[in-house]
Amino acid sequence: MARYTGPVTRKSRRLGTDLVGGDQSFEKRPYPPGQHGRARIKDSEYRQQLQEKQKARFTYGVMEKQFRRYYEEAVRHSGKTGEELLKILESRLDNVVYRAGLARTRRMARQLVSHGHFSVNGVHVNVPSYRVSQYDIIDVRDNSLNTVPFQIARETAGDRPIPSWLQVVGERQRILIHQLPERAQIEVPLTEQLIVEYYSK
């Protein structure tokens, strides 16, 4: 599947938000790249909606076609469409690995999943977009536990708060999904209603 692999800091500056988390280069220059980056650009309603959609896509590392499918699924749910969309994005396995503190960024989490380091409910899973469910159990595979990424994760455990809807247990770094997150539990700088308005046109 196609994936954006370009400079993430440049994309962060274009969209006005840190897509990585702790990106020092973005913090130094949080304005769009290029010679006119500091110039004020009048935001139209459409531009704001498009930018919010792009922020969500690049935050979670999802291509447009798949993101549109997530939106269409969210529309079919009984809750608020924007909130349901965020719940879907948060339930991706790569995001769960990131939220649990086993990877510094979502991009790194995606690589760890793709390289086959995890099982879900005892079944080997290497698809970053795999969707977890309530009561799922995610384990680091035995032959991966002592590799560098997971050693670092153990050493830095507690550096980043873990959301209350999941739990990391013991030295084996088992992840327990207590529930799927509610909107108040999702800390991400997005205004999801703008995304709904973008696709509702």
Curated annotation (Swiss-Prot):
One annotated GO biological process: translation
Region (Disordered): 1-42
Record key words, sorted: Ribonucleoprotein, Ribosomal protein, RNA-binding, rRNA-binding
GO molecular function: rRNA binding; structural constituent of ribosome
Source superkingdom: Bacteria
Cellular component aspect of the GO annotation: small ribosomal subunit
Pfam families xref list: Ribosomal_S4, S4
Xref: InterPro entries: Ribosomal_uS4 (IPR022801), Ribosomal_uS4_bac-type (IPR005709), Ribosomal_uS4_CS (IPR018079), Ribosomal_uS4_N (IPR001912), S4_RNA-bd (IPR002942), S4_RNA-bd_sf (IPR036986)
Residue ranges of every copy of the S4 RNA-binding domain listed in the record: 91-157
Keyword Protein transport listed: no
Oligomer and partners: Part of the 30S ribosomal subunit. Contacts protein S5. The interaction surface between S4 and S5 is involved in control of translational fidelity.
Family to which this protein belongs: Belongs to the universal ribosomal protein uS4 family.
NCBIfam families: PRK05327.1 (NF003717), rpsD_bact (TIGR01017)
Reported function: One of the primary rRNA binding proteins, it binds directly to 16S rRNA where it nucleates assembly of the body of the 30S subunit.
Alphabetical list of PANTHER family matching this protein: 30S 40S RIBOSOMAL PROTEIN (PTHR11831), SMALL RIBOSOMAL SUBUNIT PROTEIN US4M (PTHR11831:SF4)
Protein name: Small ribosomal subunit protein uS4
